[in-house]
């Protein structure tokens, strides 16, 4: 298989390490990386900054027409502005899961994600429905998982880096609620593609997970 046609779908629940691993894997390989969660956060940022109510269908649809998202050098741009840092705000984090449930939002972003898949060589895309919906023809599909305690600890460490002190029990409660939403939503629920390889990252370091994925890429490219 020629390298330029190689596409990897990485899915998993919140805190499974998919974004961190995808980003570092792309840096190691020199490939393109698209974090679809960042796309939802960028769209949420626009709605918050422009005081658009996502519960009001007409206002939301008008706003969606004005939103242009693009990726360049693994950074996300909202209407030509690099918002890679702004989308990590606590306000965006608080609202993104609600915005992500809206069918019109998912439809807009799915169209964009599929366009990116078609136009981008050497692509690593991570999210919750990449292997099942966005890129079902990916050359390699990975589903990352980890136990809830480990995922909560990772989230707590992320929060600490943002200067936010959080309670581990509260994070575990939030993760369980998020899992329930993600697995049971009607539109593109979180699920492992039948041909995806399950990787439990609970006891693995980032480098160990990346080494396993690179071995899987090599194996795929030999077949």
Curated annotation (Swiss-Prot):
Keyword Nucleotide-binding: yes
InterPro entries listed in its UniProt record: Cytidylate_kin, Cytidylate_kinase_dom, P-loop_NTPase
Pfam families (UniProt xref): Cytidylate_kin
One of the record's GO cellular component terms: cytosol
Chief localization: cytoplasm
UniProt record, GO biological process: nucleobase-containing small molecule interconversion; pyrimidine nucleotide metabolic process
Enzyme class: transferase
Coiled coil residues, start to end: none
Domain of life: Bacteria
Residues annotated for ATP binding in this entry: 12-20
Keyword Lipid biosynthesis: no
EC code: 2.7.4.25
Any one GO molecular-function label of the UniProt entry: CMP kinase activity
Recorded catalytic activity of this chain's protein: CMP + ATP = CDP + ADP; dCMP + ATP = dCDP + ADP
Keywords linked to the UniProt accession: ATP-binding, Cytoplasm, Kinase, Nucleotide-binding, Transferase
PANTHER family xrefs: CYTIDYLATE KINASE, CYTIDYLATE KINASE/PANTOATE-BETA-ALANINE LIGASE
Family: Belongs to the cytidylate kinase family. Type 1 subfamily.
HAMAP family registered for this protein in UniProt: Cytidyl_kinase_type1
Protein name: Cytidylate kinase
Species of the source: Onion yellows phytoplasma (strain OY-M)
Taxonomic path: Bacteria, Bacillati, Mycoplasmatota, Mollicutes, Acholeplasmatales
Gene: cmk
């Amino acid at each position: 298989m020629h390298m330029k046609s190689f596409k990897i779908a990485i899915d998993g629940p919140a805190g499974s390490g998919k974004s961190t691993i995808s980003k570092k894997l792309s840096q190691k390989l020199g490939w393109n990386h698209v974090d679809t969660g960042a796309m939802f956060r960028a769209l949420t940022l626009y709605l918050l900054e422009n005081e658009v109510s996502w519960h009001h269908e007409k206002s939301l649809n008008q706003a969606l027409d004005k939103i242009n998202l693009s990726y360049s050098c693994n950074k996300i741009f909202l209407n030509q502005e690099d918002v890679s840092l702004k989308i990590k705000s606590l306000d965006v984090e608080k609202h993104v899961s609600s915005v992500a449930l809206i069918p019109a939002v998912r439809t807009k972003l799915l169209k964009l994600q599929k366009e990116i898949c078609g136009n981008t060589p050497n692509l690593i895309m991570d999210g919750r429905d990449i292997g099942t919906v966005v890129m079902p023809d990916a050359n390699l599909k990975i589903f990352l998982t980890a136990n809830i305690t480990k995922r909560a600890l990772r989230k707590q460490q992320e929060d600490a880096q943002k200067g936010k002190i959080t309670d581990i029990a509260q994070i575990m409660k939030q993760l369980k609620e998020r899992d329930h939403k993600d697995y049971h939503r009607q539109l593109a629920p979180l699920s492992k593609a039948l041909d995806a390889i399950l990787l439990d990252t609970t006891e693995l370091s980032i480098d160990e997970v990346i080494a396993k994925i690179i071995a899987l890429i090599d194996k795929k490219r030999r077949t």
